[in-house]
């Protein structure tokens, strides 16, 4: 994963960090410290970040742009610009852009580190 910033960089323009791929969502690390990661997810129409969990890390998702669904444990939330979702450690979660043509942008923080990514083998959203 490309790291755009560092501990020294404290100001970002999210529009400049946005980049969309045709086949799979893009994740960029804007910065990291010894205690947390801060990423941007660029999710094109119809794409998703598949169901996974972080055994020892909490995650906060903020939806900057777009509409979609966010699975968090047994709940599925309709999300839109301005929504915030807290994902406690070890809770399976996924994000899906449900719009036919618009992009989705989500920023997120993960802490504490290391943040281990474990795939969960079930379809998150039907």
Range-by-range predicted roles:
Residues 89-116:
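Ligand-binding loop in jelly-roll beta-barrel domains
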Residues 34-36, 41, 75-77:
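Well-ordered beta-strand scaffold positions
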Residues 42-44, 53-70, 109:
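Short, conserved beta-strand element in jelly-roll/cupin
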Residues 1-36, 121-126:
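A short, N-terminal "cap"/entry segment at the start of jelly-roll beta-barrel domains
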Residues 74-89:
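Short acidic-glycine-tyrosine-enriched beta hairpin
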Residues 67-69, 76, 92, 103:
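Structural motif
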Residues 26, 30-37, 46-60:
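A short beta-loop-beta micro-motif enriched in histidine and acidic residues
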């Amino acid at each position: 994963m490309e790291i755009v910033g560092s501990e020294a960089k404290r100001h970002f323009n999210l529009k400049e960090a946005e980049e969309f791929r045709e086949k799979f969502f893009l994740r960029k690390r804007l910065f990291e410290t010894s205690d947390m990661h801060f990423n941007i997810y660029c999710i094109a129409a119809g794409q998703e970040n598949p169901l996974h969990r972080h055994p020892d890390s909490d995650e906060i998702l903020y939806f900057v742009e777009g509409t979609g669904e966010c699975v968090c444990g047994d709940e599925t939330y309709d999300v839109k610009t301005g929504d915030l979702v807290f994902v406690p450690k070890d809770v399976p979660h996924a994000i899906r852009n449900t719009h036919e043509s618009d992009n989705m942008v989500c920023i997120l923080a993960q802490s504490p580190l290391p943040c281990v990514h474990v795939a969960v083998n079930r379809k998150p959203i039907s």
